[in-house]
């Protein structure tokens, strides 16, 4: 079996990488930190014009008809470039959940294809039916509604800003009710695979954070000199840099492999694979970004370094869509249940 990317997927990733480098990066991220979203919003509009924001919307609704793997490739490149845009929510999670809810969600899908932007309301541990008045809105943008997924309906509702750890992807809190709503009687059946897809996309975003932070560290140790030579010449530093590469390549393989499996495997396997992928990438990304900061030395812990932006985004992603402990606890419970509720005590 050939696990390599197709020529079209290689081209998609390359195009997304080039576009992200042109539209975003440290200067745009710094402007957002200062409260100026003009360039970030312009970049988001250009992603929409390029068709990347509607990649997961089916052809019949005006989108690109892409796969989850395609969306994960783009997600990784955008997060590596510190893109302060709602790609993971508006371009990935919302289309997946709307498509999984049945034919009555056509209005949401068509709106995304036409350029509408939504945040995403989630309850604790991604428990969509319980995402009530206290639900957190991910990727909150002032003046934009968030999509709330209920037991048998989709609803757009307003939100206001809320404290969060990641300034590039701010949080909101729901304020009252209102907005459009759509009946979605098939939501319970379709949302399981959609939620699995969202978790895999989050794993791809974490991979992007790790890629960006690792590149910062590699560039630094190649040029920073001590005792008359680059610090990359010292064995201890080389080992740390190599560990970054190992974690990065594993995260990349895990997220992309899981993307294919979630779309093609039975739902029980898809949910387990997505949970493990999200858990692994969450822990690996945070751990390795912290290693990147250590390689950067004193500058790595300053406001002037961009390393803290990658770390803050990674922490928020790791806690979103199900934290590591809750996901692995669920995987373990399912494993025990499959064995008849018994354990032989072996590890």
Locations of the language-model features?
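Short alpha-helical interface patches
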Residues: 62, 75-78, 89, 185-192
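FAD-binding core of flavoproteins
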Residues: 85-86, 103-215, 219, 345-347
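Amphipathic alpha-helical regulatory segments at dimerization interfaces
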Residues: 22, 46, 96-99, 111
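N-terminal glycine-rich flavin-associated loop
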Residues: 85-102
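Alpha-helical interface subdomain recognition
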Residues: 1-79, 199-347
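Short N-terminal amphipathic alpha-helices
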Residues: 55-59, 83-90
């Amino acid at each position: 079996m050939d696990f390599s990317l197709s020529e079209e997927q290689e081209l998609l990733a390359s195009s997304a990488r080039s576009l992200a480098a042109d539209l975003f990066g440290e200067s745009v991220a710094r402007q957002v930190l200062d409260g100026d979203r003009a360039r970030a919003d312009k970049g988001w509009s250009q992603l929409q014009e390029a068709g990347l924001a509607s990649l997961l919307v089916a052809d019949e609704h005006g989108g690109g008809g892409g796969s989850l793997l395609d969306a994960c490739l783009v997600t990784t490149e955008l997060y590596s470039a510190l893109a302060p845009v709602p790609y993971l929510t508006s371009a990935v999670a919302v289309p997946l959940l709307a498509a999984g809810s049945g034919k009555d969600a056509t209005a949401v899908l068509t709106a995304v294809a036409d350029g509408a932007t939504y945040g995403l309301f989630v309850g604790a541990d991604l428990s969509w039916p319980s995402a009530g008045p206290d639900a957190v809105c991910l990727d909150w943008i002032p003046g934009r509604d968030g999509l709330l997924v209920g037991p048998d309906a989709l609803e757009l509702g307003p939100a206001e800003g809320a404290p969060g750890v990641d300034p590039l992807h701010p949080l909101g809190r729901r304020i009252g009710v209102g907005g459009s709503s759509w009946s979605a009687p098939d939501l319970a059946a379709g949302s399981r695979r959609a939620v699995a897809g969202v978790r895999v996309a989050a794993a791809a975003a974490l991979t992007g954070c790790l890629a960006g932070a690792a590149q910062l560290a590699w560039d630094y140790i190649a040029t920073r000199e001590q005792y008359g030579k680059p610090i990359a010449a010292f064995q201890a530093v080389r080992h740390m840099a190599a560990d970054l590469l190992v974690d990065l390549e594993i995260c990349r393989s895990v997220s992309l492999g899981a993307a294919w499996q979630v779309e093609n495997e039975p739902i029980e396997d898809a949910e387990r694979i997505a949970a493990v992928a999200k858990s692994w990438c969450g822990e690996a990304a945070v751990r390795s970004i912290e290693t990147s900061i250590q390689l950067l030395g004193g500058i790595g812990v300053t406001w002037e370094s961009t390393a803290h932006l990658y770390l803050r985004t990674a922490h928020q992603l790791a806690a979103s869509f199900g934290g590591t402990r809750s996901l692995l606890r669920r995987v373990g419970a399912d494993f025990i249940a499959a064995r008849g509720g018994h354990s032989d005590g072996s590890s």
